[in-house]
Design a protein with these regions (language model features):
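Predominantly flavin-linked oxidoreductase catalytic cores and closely associated redox partners
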Residues: 9-13, 93-228, 240-245
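An accessory alpha-helical subdomain
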Residues: 230-232
Length: 255
């Protein structure tokens, strides 16, 4: 996703009009493989594609429950498939733009030139933007702490109206913490459809069914027992001050 968003930015900048751009993707990007949710105070470049916007939120913890306005901000949900389609429709046939479906085997960076070894051959460039994430360097060190923000989410459709579509449940900490930081996150699309995520901040990940048990337990506690799971998603975001930028070179930039 970051590579396609970078392509959009480059192709909308006149400076790169005559630059040749090669995009290498292992898989064709045309599905909802991720969901972005973000704050914005004004109209943004993706407003025509957002699934939902909210201007109110709810926060819960043990013995605490309050609603608040987000003004002047809005919280926005954006699904990836519509972004992929928009960028590919606008830029896949653009002049000096080439898409290659291939697996990247190795990236060899020298100061002024980077070589990319793929399943379809080798390529060289004076400037490479790399969105592949290799956690080994981050995990094989002790200087910078690493905390994981990890989650599993369900897009569900309930049999009965169950959600207030005007506000997000930004965080509900009123669940068993088990000596960690755990919360539920709920984005209601309408009265019957919502994204429900079970999220943790912790050192270690859980087995997949442990996240799903957390979602089921939460829905049961709210009296929501009849629903259809439309989609599932899973994510893990490292929270660290590890200096990734130190791996950049003159010809290779990690994004």
């Amino acid at each position: 996703a970051s590579g396609l968003l970078l392509l959009k930015a480059l192709r909308e900048d006149a400076f790169f009009e005559n630059r040749s751009i090669l995009i290498i993707e292992k898989e064709i990007k045309n599905k909802n493989d991720r969901t972005w949710s973000y704050w914005e105070s004004l109209d943004g470049p993706f407003d025509s594609m957002v699934t939902k916007k909210w201007s109110k939120a709810q926060f819960c913890s043990q013995g605490l429950n309050f609603d608040f306005d987000l003004d002047p901000f809005q919280y926005k949900m954006l699904r990836s498939a519509v972004i992929y389609q928009d960028i590919l429709n606008k830029h896949s046939r653009a002049k000096n733009t080439t898409f290659l479906q291939a697996e990247v085997k190795e990236i060899i960076s020298k100061e002024n030139l980077t070589e990319i070894v793929t399943s379809e051959g080798k390529f060289h460039s004076k400037k490479v933007f790399n969105s592949l994430f290799d956690p080994k360097a981050m995990m094989n060190q002790k200087r910078y702490p690493v905390l994981h923000q990890h989650f599993v989410g369900w897009f569900i459709k309930t049999k009965e109206p169950s959600f207030d579509s005007r506000k997000i449940l930004f965080m509900d900490f009123d669940i068993p913490q088990l000596q960690e930081t755990r919360f539920l996150y709920l984005l209601p699309i309408d009265k019957n459809n919502a994204l429900v995520e079970y999220t943790l901040f912790s050192e270690n990940l859980l087995k997949f069914d442990a996240y799903e048990t957390g979602i089921v337990d939460y829905l049961n506690s709210k009296g929501i027992t009849e629903y259809e799971i439309k989609e599932k998603e899973q994510g893990n975001i490292p929270m660290t001050c590890f200096p990734f930028e130190e791996s950049n070179t003159q010809s290779l930039l990690y994004i």
